[in-house]
Design a protein with these regions (language model features):
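Conserved SGNH/GDSL esterase-like catalytic core that processes O-acyl groups on lipids
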Residues: 86, 110-112, 118-199
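Solvent-exposed, polar/charged alpha-helical surfaces in well-ordered, non-transmembrane soluble domains
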Residues: 132, 136, 159, 163, ...
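Helix-to-loop transition at the C-terminal end of transmembrane segments
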Residues: 26-38
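Membrane/wall-proximal cationic-aromatic binding patches
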Residues: 36-137, 305, 313-316, 320-324
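Histidine-centered active-site loop/cap adjacent to the catalytic His
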Residues: 28, 247, 317-354
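Serine-dependent acyl-ester chemistry module
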Residues: 178-311, 315-326
Length: 354
């Protein structure tokens, strides 16, 4: 008999806790069930309070985008390190500490760059991505805004121009072409129907507030490693973005960029390193069809090897122009990209009425 009272008290406490949690879950479901998914994602984002300083993982430097075909974008106001290199983003959520007015200053030639991790500057520090080098080389009349984000494909880049960059009144657009412009985005947003009756709003909220911050992603995004996700959720997520994969999607995106830029008389440069093979030829054809300039930087890279009396083979190329064990352009490669772009851009700018 004496044992029954403590057991009863413990049971009562546990039941009360269960009912409180159940009530909280029901309340969250009732409130957010009739609202947009982005509303709950915003609450999770505030609860998560992801760091903006210190050593940042890839999942901590991006956030879900409000535009479906952009999918995700850089978080504004970052001031830390990424892959051991300094990283800053400004109020627009683009790489670099320099702030740009939304209204273009008089007498300014404004350039926007669209690309993935190569343009973003994966593995190099502040001042070292080629668009930052280019801006410095061109001088004070020029602004170069880097909208490059790791893992972007061609459709995302054009959507970024349409919904984010076009309103900044650019005079020139640079698109960095590489082979994965035809592939799936690095991160995906979860399908809106993914939150089922078995999925807990309360658990997500607690995870966002108290869970590990190590390499986590924005609440509106699925983790890059999707192997641990439910197979049906993976299938739905991939299906949601099937329209932006493959050569037809790329060609459609380039045609859309052509429509948007021709209407305002804005020239477009497609920057590539080589641009041969099936994918490169497709990019060349898309550029020609839309009146873009296809700029192959590889002759300058080859000339550098000649100047340094180095062999022209794959291993020498990799060790000279790539980050070790990574494959992304190193500081030297970014310098050469900037050099290649500078001459072409000065020629275009001279034809502009200031």
């Amino acid at each position: 008999m004496p044992l029954r009272k403590p057991l009863f008290a413990t049971g009562a406490v546990l039941l009360s806790m269960f009912l409180a949690l159940l009530l909280a879950e029901v309340g969250l479901r009732v409130y957010f069930g009739s609202r947009e998914p982005a509303d709950f994602a915003a609450v999770l984002r505030r609860a998560r309070n992801a760091p903006r300083t210190g050593a940042l993982a890839l999942g901590q430097i991006v956030q879900a985008s409000a535009w479906p075909d952009i999918v995700y974008e850089l978080r504004p106001g970052l001031d830390g390190t990424f892959r051991g290199q300094t990283l800053r983003t400004n109020a627009l959520g683009i790489r670099g500490a320099r702030e740009y007015a939304r209204e273009k200053p008089a007498g300014t030639f404004r350039i926007v760059g669209l690309g993935d991790s190569n343009m973003f500057g994966w593995g190099v520090g502040e001042g070292e991505p080629y668009l930052q080098i280019l801006e410095k080389r061109l001088g004070p009349r020029f602004e170069v805004l880097n909208f490059g984000v790791p893992g972007y494909n061609g459709v995302m880049e054009v959507s970024t121009y349409e919904h984010r960059a076009a309103e900044l009144a650019p005079d020139l657009v640079i698109v960095h072409f590489i082979g994965n412009d035809f592939g799936l985005p690095h991160f995906l947003q979860a399908p809106e129907e993914a939150r089922s009756l078995l999925h807990s709003y309360l658990w997500e909220l607690l995870q966002a507030r108290f869970g590990s911050k190590e390499d986590e992603v924005d609440p509106g995004l699925l983790p890059h490693d999707r192997s641990q996700l439910d197979p049906e959720l993976r299938r739905q997520a991939r299906g949601r973005y099937a329209h932006m994969m493959g050569k037809d999607a790329y060609l459609k995106a380039m045609n859309r960029l052509g429509e948007l830029t021709r209407a305002r008389g804005i020239p477009v440069i497609i920057l590539s390193l080589g641009g041969s093979g099936e994918q490169g030829n497709l990019a060349r054809q898309a550029a020609a069809a839309n009146g873009f300039t296809f700029l192959d930087a590889s002759p300058r890279f080859y000339r550098y090897l000649v100047e340094q009396r180095m062999r022209d083979d794959r291993e020498v190329w990799r060790s000279t122009f790539r980050i070790p064990h990574d494959g992304h352009p190193n500081r030297l490669a970014h310098e050469l990209y900037a050099e290649v772009l500078e001459g072409t851009i000065r020629s275009l700018a001279e034809r502009r009425t200031w």
